[in-house]
């Protein structure tokens, strides 16, 4: 039988851990993996290690690009950082605490995740999909800014004109931009973006990375999975090269994106050179 003495304790179960996050100081690590091991089983065979003792961190105010060949573990690492996979060993910390410390609501207020695929089971409009990014802030003072943040996110992702369109009727690129707007509207200190440029044309690819750079300049921590090494060189503060589930190199683009390393990791001859006019770093496959 419950008594009045139980009520404060029961109430704390519903409120514990739901404090609103504060903006991290520039340079403060928001997300860290230590000794991360992720395994997957296929059928009755032994487990396959897809991440092997990975150490990784991202700090407020920087963009870190995850690059590497297909199957290297980029998306798996992003999913583990997001708390969507249970590691076999090691762990992930968000804002200084293990992911298990946070409720799903608390994590949604601290990091936003853009997956590779964008599916919605009902014919919500594009604006309604973007508004889903504000769900973690319901019944908080930050909900007062919902309309402004939704409008700003849609403008930034160039989807304002799609506001009334049903999400399932949009093209692949339009769906990707609406999904990005949802992540922007969520307004979290950490952004995890899995191949945000994959379905986009050249102009929108550049626009998306400029948005990520703007968020980092404003103090967000951004992790982005990319296949285009030239875009990674142009926009990332750091590049982590994954190879067979391990981090082969992690550092500034010019230190990491070298001919020798990329040729070895991608198992194809690669040429790294500077643009003759702008000096920008270019990464090109060697073609006969």
From Swiss-Prot:
The keyword Cell membrane applies. Residues 31-269 form the ABC transporter domain. Gene3D superfamilies: P-loop containing nucleotide triphosphate hydrolases (3.40.50.300). The keyword Manganese does not apply. It comes from the Bacteria. Its main location: membrane. InterPro entries: AAA+_ATPase, ABC_transporter-like_ATP-bd, ABC_transporter-like_CS, P-loop_NTPase. PROSITE patterns: ABC_TRANSPORTER_1 (PS00211), ABC_TRANSPORTER_2 (PS50893), HMUV (PS51261). SMART domains: AAA. Keywords: ATP-binding, Cell membrane, Membrane, Nucleotide-binding, Translocase, Transport. GO terms for molecular function: ATP binding; ATP hydrolysis activity. Belongs to the ABC transporter superfamily. Heme (hemin) importer (TC 3.A.1.14.5) family. Part of the ABC transporter complex HmuTUV involved in hemin import. Responsible for energy coupling to the transport system. This is Hemin import ATP-binding protein HmuV.
């Amino acid at each position: 039988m419950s008594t009045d003495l139980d009520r404060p304790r029961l109430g704390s179960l519903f409120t514990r851990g739901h404090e609103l996050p504060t903006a991290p100081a520039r340079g403060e690590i928001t997300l860290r993996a230590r000794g991360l091991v992720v395994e997957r089983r296929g059928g009755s065979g032994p487990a396959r290690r897809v991440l092997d003792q990975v150490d990784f961190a991202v700090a407020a105010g920087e963009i870190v690009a995850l690059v590497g060949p297909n199957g290297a573990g980029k998306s798996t690492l992003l999913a583990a950082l997001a708390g969507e996979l249970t590691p076999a060993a090691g762990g992930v910390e968000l804002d200084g605490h293990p992911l298990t410390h946070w409720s799903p609501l608390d994590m949604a207020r601290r990091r936003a995740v853009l997956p590779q695929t964008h599916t919605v089971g009902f014919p919500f409009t594009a604006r309604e999909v973007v508004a889903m990014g504000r769900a973690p802030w319901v019944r908080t003072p930050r909900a007062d800014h919902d309309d402004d943040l939704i409008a700003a996110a849609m403008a930034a992702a160039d989807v304002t004109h799609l506001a009334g369109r049903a999400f399932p009727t949009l093209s692949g690129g339009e769906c990707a931009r609406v999904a990005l707007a949802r992540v922007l509207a969520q307004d979290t200190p950490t952004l995890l973006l899995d191949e945000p440029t994959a379905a986009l044309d050249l102009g929108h690819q550049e626009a998306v990375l400029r948005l990520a750079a703007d968020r980092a300049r404003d103090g967000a921590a951004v992790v982005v999975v990319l296949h285009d090494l030239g875009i990674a060189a142009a926009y990332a503060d750091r590049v982590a090269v994954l190879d067979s589930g391990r981090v082969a190199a992690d550092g500034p683009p010019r230190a990491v994106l070298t001919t020798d390393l990329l040729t070895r990791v991608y198992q194809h001859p690669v040429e790294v050179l500077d643009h003759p006019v702008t000096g920008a770093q270019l990464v090109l496959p060697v073609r006969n």
